[in-house]
Amino acid sequence: MVPQELIEKIKLISPGTELRKALDDIINANFGALIFLVDDPKKYEDIIQGGFWLDTDFSAEKLYELSKMDGAIVLSEDITKIYYANVHLVPDPTIPTGETGTRHRTAERLAKQTGKVVIAVSRRRNIISLYYKNYKYVVNQVDFLISKVTQAISTLEKYKDNFNKLLSELEVLELENRVTLADVVRTLAKGFELLRIVEEIRPYIVELGEEGRLARMQLRELTEDVDDLLVLLVMDYSSEEVDEEAAQDIMQDFVKKRDPSPISISRALGYDVQQVAQLDDVLVSARGYRLLKTVARIPLSIGYNVVRMFKTLDQISKASVEDLKKVEGIGEKRARAISESISSLKHRKTSE
């Protein structure tokens, strides 16, 4: 999974940016380049040697012309200025590097030493490599990226359909108060898998830049409510009450893990289970956070008060409008919204 801080740097060289235009022109001309992005060039006077000082406004055309010289180029971090051209960059030679070519060895060492972005363009292989801190990212061809993203979105659509199906089945079981831990874990696992795919393809979409607008729209549409639903499920089914922030942490931990086991998800929810077979034997009751927020449209801040009074969704569903009005923040309108939304959901699920 590509870290968010690296994704932010990949945006600098995405198609549609002036910097990417220059890099593509450099590759097409069969040139090489070494580009160092800095906040203040004076900080790096011991590293930047020779060359000449420009301090001129950045443009793709200027960068392309300057790349015809052998030396490196120093730009401002916001890609608005060209500070130096034709310089010799001298990072600490004792910093370990796994690269072989001189340009790429310098780039890796420089990024590790300064924590800044360094871009190397290989003349021989026509490849753009971005180095940042201890990270390296090799820029992909647009055709490859589009193919990769298209496949991933197709997979996401199937996962979202399955996730929605599991949620629908869970709703039926919730209304009948016969949910097992296995049902909850199965639904959470599918949601975690869905978000993991999103995290894996996000760098590709960022790298596509303007070419990825449609993919970004599709991704947003497919996943806009998944995070919230998973957080609410964790809040509903944790063995001990957890707030939204704690539930968010649990969700994020599992999105980062590859193929989390049903046992690990169960234990994160606070259940002491040793074998997967046990999950079918553990009956659990929803607190009602998800239904209150997504079906009855009750704000989570008020939902806390409802759950605090009634404890479970089963008890909420049995409460009268008058009972519900006793909750702080619940008036006639919200009480009826809760009561009627649960009744409507029961009727809809019964008729399906």
UniProtKB/Swiss-Prot annotation:
Catalytic function, reaction form: 2 ATP = 3',3'-c-di-AMP + 2 diphosphate
Keyword Cell wall biogenesis/degradation: no
DAC domain: residues covered: 3-143
Residues reported to bind ATP: 71, 89, 102-106
SUPFAM superfamilies: RuvA domain 2-like, YojJ-like
Keywords from the named record: ATP-binding, DNA damage, DNA repair, DNA-binding, Magnesium, Nucleotide-binding, Nucleotidyltransferase, Transferase
Example of a GO biological process term: DNA repair
Xref: InterPro entries: DisA, DisA_sf, DNA_integrity_DisA_N_sf, DNA_integrity_scan_DisA_link, DNA_integrity_scan_DisA_N, DNA_integrity_scanning_protein, HhH_motif, RuvA_2-like
MF annotations from Gene Ontology: adenylate cyclase activity; ATP binding; catalytic activity, acting on DNA; diadenylate cyclase activity; DNA binding; hydrolase activity
Cofactor(s) named in the record: Mg(2+)
Its EC number(s): 2.7.7.85
Family: Belongs to the DisA family.
Protein's job: Participates in a DNA-damage check-point. DisA forms globular foci that rapidly scan along the chromosomes searching for lesions. Also has diadenylate cyclase activity, catalyzing the condensation of 2 ATP molecules into cyclic di-AMP (c-di-AMP). c-di-AMP likely acts as a signaling molecule that may couple DNA integrity with a cellular process.
SUBUNIT field: Homooctamer.
Protein name per UniProt: DNA integrity scanning protein DisA
Gene, per the UniProt record: disA
